[in-house]
From Swiss-Prot:
Assigned protein family: Belongs to the prokaryotic pantothenate kinase family.
Localization per record: Cytoplasm
SUPFAM superfamilies: P-loop containing nucleoside triphosphate hydrolases
HAMAP family in the cross-refs: Pantothen_kinase_1
Residue ranges of the TM segments: none
Top-level taxon in the UniProt lineage: Bacteria
Annotated EC: 2.7.1.33
Gene name of this polypeptide: coaA
GO molecular function: ATP binding; pantothenate kinase activity
Name of the featured protein: Pantothenate kinase
PANTHER family: URIDINE KINASE
A GO BP annotation: coenzyme A biosynthetic process
Organism of origin: Shigella boydii serotype 18 (strain CDC 3083-94 / BS512)
Pathway assigned in UniProt: Cofactor biosynthesis; coenzyme A biosynthesis; CoA from (R)-pantothenate: step 1/5
Keyword ATP-binding listed: yes
Length: 316
């Protein structure tokens, strides 16, 4: 089989950076450099150019999909003779720890909310749906945080199911990275958004990952468009270690931080600790649970050095 034939058989359209940037068309930049600086993560270089060449074309594509979805809802309402409920369009963002999912989510939230339609965009991270530390300790799962079994999947699925069912007020638990735990009584109420962005490690999992439980319902069953943020493993490890070092000098210095003791480490000790955490927890989770879901995404953003997206793959 020729390379051309193999290319034609892929379920994805592939764009290099320049090809993707051309899809921006005439969409105006709606974010200032100061706003972009506030949106980026602790260890990322997010430039005006990156937003213009990668995220503006993506927001344009998503706006087309969302408008199409609304038209389809209107057809159903016309057929049934009903007044429509506000059913949000759900976008999920998956990928490894340290790949930049949160930044992608925040940028898309800002861009999508500034389209002329003025749609209301909510952002929820699945961290809030982790079991509280007390439960994880009882189950021996503290070193498995972020693995599928560490989440209250029933509550997470009910959350997205309620939103898709038109429930007007839905609550989501909130996670604090300072205390490394779910905030007691800190729930956030989500009130009928037009768009919900759901960001998390395992949001692309499906029944294929649980063949022993074929009747399981998953978050992915309710998602309209899914994004996987990808990068080579060596870069992910480097980004994770660099982020850990920055936390050591910043967030970890807070006496209330769960990881306050890490602030006392020397740089060499901190690098060694970060590498151990990466290999024993985050790399393992990536290989076992996250990476196998990549090819299910509607769109894959592949990053190179400096968190710059070098390739985009869009499912046909």
């Amino acid at each position: 089989m020729s390379i051309k034939e193999q290319t034609l058989m892929t379920p994805y359209l592939q764009f290099d950076r320049n090809q993707w940037a051309a899809q921006r068309d005439s969409v105006p930049m709606t974010l200032s450099e100061d706003e972009i600086a506030r949106l980026k993560g602790i260890n990322e270089d997010l430039s005006l150019e990156e937003v213009a060449e990668i995220y503006l074309p993506l927001s344009r594509l998503l706006n087309f999909y969302i408008s199409s979805n609304l038209r389809r809802q209107a057809v159903l309402e016309q057929f049934l003779g009903t007044n429509g409920q506000r059913i949000p369009y759900i976008i999920s963002i998956a990928g490894s720890v340290a790949v930049g999912k949160s930044t992608t989510a925040r940028v898309l939230q800002a861009l999508l909310s500034r389209w002329p339609e003025h749609r209301r965009v909510e952002l929820i991270t699945t961290d809030g749906f982790l079991h509280p530390n007390q439960v994880l300790k009882e189950r021996g799962l503290m070193k498995k945080k972020g693995f599928p079994e560490s989440y209250d999947m029933h509550r997470l699925v009910k959350f997205v199911s309620d939103l898709k069912s038109g429930v007007p007020n839905v609550t989501a638990p909130v996670y604090s990275h300072l205390i490394y735990d779910v905030i007691p009584d800190g729930d956030k109420t989500v009130v009928q958004p037009d768009i919900l962005i759901l960001e998390g490690l395992n949001v692309l999992q499906s029944g294929m990952d649980y063949p022993h439980d074929p009747h399981h319902v998953f978050v992915s069953d309710f998602v309209d468009f899914s994004i996987y943020v990808d990068a080579p493993e060596d870069l992910l490890q480097t980004w994770y270690i660099n982020r850990f070092l920055k936390f050591r000098e910043g967030a970890f210095t807070d006496p209330d931080s769960y990881f306050h003791n890490y602030a006392k480490l020397t740089k060499e000790e901190a690098i060694k600790t970060a590498m151990t955490l990466w290999k024993e927890i985050n790399w393992l989770n990536l290989k076992q649970n996250i990476l196998p879901t990549r090819e299910r995404a509607s769109l894959i953003l592949t990053k190179s050095a400096n968190h710059a997206v070098e390739e985009v793959r869009l499912r046909k």
